[in-house]
């Protein structure tokens, strides 16, 4: 009887430890969001065949930029990828495994997948542009796919951002 009680307690503790160690979205945000977005883009017939999933992922990766592009590179979804662990994504997706679990498996294969983080977005309505570094001002323009030809000083970048702000900033009323 005591042995049975100990087995139940150990089993409960093991389950508790497993759930507390489960990967959370914020621990591997680029992976989880990219896998979810990719899975949502697939139709039902494609989701059943892992080979079709791999083909669709390679096509999906061609349109990605920044962190998602790097994620694709790590998995082998790009032609220039050095390694390929695409089956670690495609097979679990064909089994309808959740994105968090897929990313947990991917992290075990390649830890740098979960090192990818989205950069914090700058709220242009509340930030004082004069207090930002030129690097951050350039990043704002780059994110907008805009350039600042002839900008040499910080004031030039601020002026260009102020000109473009109505076009790109979303202000809620």
Curated annotation (Swiss-Prot):
Signal peptide (UniProt feature, chain positions): 1-22
One of the record's GO cellular component terms: endoplasmic reticulum
Upper classification of the organism: Eukaryota, Metazoa, Ecdysozoa, Arthropoda, Hexapoda
Organism: Drosophila melanogaster
Effects seen without this gene: Total loss of dopaminergic neurites and drastic reduction in dopamine levels followed by degeneration of axonal bundles in the embryonic central nervous system and subsequent nonapoptotic cell death. Also exhibits cuticular defects.
Keyword field: Developmental protein, Disulfide bond, Secreted, Signal
Function: Required during the maturation of the embryonic nervous system for maintenance of neuronal and cuticular connectivity. Essential for maintenance of dopaminergic neurons and dopamine levels.
InterPro entries registered for this protein in UniProt: ARMET-like, ARMET_C, ARMET_N, EF_Hand_1_Ca_BS, SAP_dom_sf
Tissue expression from the record: In stage 12, expression is seen in the stomodeum and the salivary gland primordia, and weakly in the mesoderm. From stage 13 onward, expression is in Garland cells, the outer wall of the proventriculus and salivary glands. Punctuate expression is also in the ventral nerve cord (VNC), specifically in eagle (eg)-positive cell body glia. Epidermal expression is seen at stage 15.
Family annotation (PANTHER family): ARMET-LIKE PROTEIN, MESENCEPHALIC ASTROCYTE-DERIVED NEUROTROPHIC FACTOR HOMOLOG
Protein name: Mesencephalic astrocyte-derived neurotrophic factor homolog
Source superkingdom: Eukaryota
GO biological process, one term: neuron projection development
Underlying gene: Manf
